[in-house]
Amino acid sequence: MKRSFIGILIFLGLWLIMVQSCMKFRISDSKAKEQFEKVGVPLTTATVKLGSSQMHYAKTGNDSLPTIVFVHGSPGSWDAFSLYMQDKDLLKQYRMISIDRPGFGYSNFGDAKHIDEQSALISPLFNLWKNGKPIYLIGHSLGGPMLIQLNADNPGLCKGLVLLAGSVDPAEEKKEKWRYILDAGIISYLLPGAFKPSNKELIFFKKDIYSLQNKFAFVKCKVIIVHGTQDSFVPVGNATYAQSKLVNADSVRLILIPGANHFIPWTKYETIKQILLALN
């Protein structure tokens, strides 16, 4: 009996170690640079200390060009947009930067934050990136509402926003009460890798999405909303809702992709690429 109990403890210990080391949805700087080198694209990575926190990002392209900043969803990391950052056509027009949002990748991995707290950590980076040329923000899924928050916190910063399957409508946000169970005690430690901070920030977002509503009025640049009509994770109603809320935007263009799912940055790569090429 005693041996069985010890065996169970050892198994649980090994399981905890395994799940926390797997599925982090991130890539080391050295491996990423190696992959980019194979396609002939120099990659720069950096980690910036901000008090007790750190922000990690990757960059490609000429520093004298207009900038595209990619903001990933949940879970995820900067390399969700690797294909775009390697694209030779995009590189002719843009410098491209992709961040690890707080709690993911190498930006204090595991420490989930509310979106206003995330914005407070991301915003100082723009001072490092300013080059006198336009900045465009591209956000997928939970990266979509991050764009609204960032724009409100940094008035006049961006020339344009592109929301890809962005979650912004409180009425469309699923209750998902099971997330609170997964966040409780030892159960939370059984969640593998990036799923733990993802679960936590999605719990936060159930409240954050309401405080986000008064941020739309601060968006005064042009906005493009792209959404798949068959998105089962973030229903297409979010797209039309965003369009109705962006009353002060310079312009709002809604692009609905028939039959497309939630993963349009990858399943509809050419469509998104052409949208980005036409931004500037």
Describe the predicted segments one by one.
Residues 199-215:
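Active-site nucleophile elbow and catalytic-triad environment of alpha/beta-hydrolase enzymes
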Residues 145-152, 161-188:
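Flexible "cap/lid" loop of the alpha/beta hydrolase fold
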Residues 60-105:
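Conserved HGGG/HGGXW glycine-rich cap/lid loop of the alpha/beta-hydrolase fold
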Residues 221, 235-245:
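Short alpha-helix in the alpha/beta-hydrolase fold that links the catalytic acid
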Residues 260-269:
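Catalytic histidine-centered segment of alpha/beta-hydrolase-like enzymes
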Residues 98-135:
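Active-site loop/oxyanion-hole signature of alpha/beta-hydrolase fold enzymes
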Residues 230-234, 262-263:
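Acidic catalytic loop of the alpha/beta-hydrolase fold
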Residues 219, 225-227, 231:
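Short beta-strand/loop motif that positions the catalytic acidic residue
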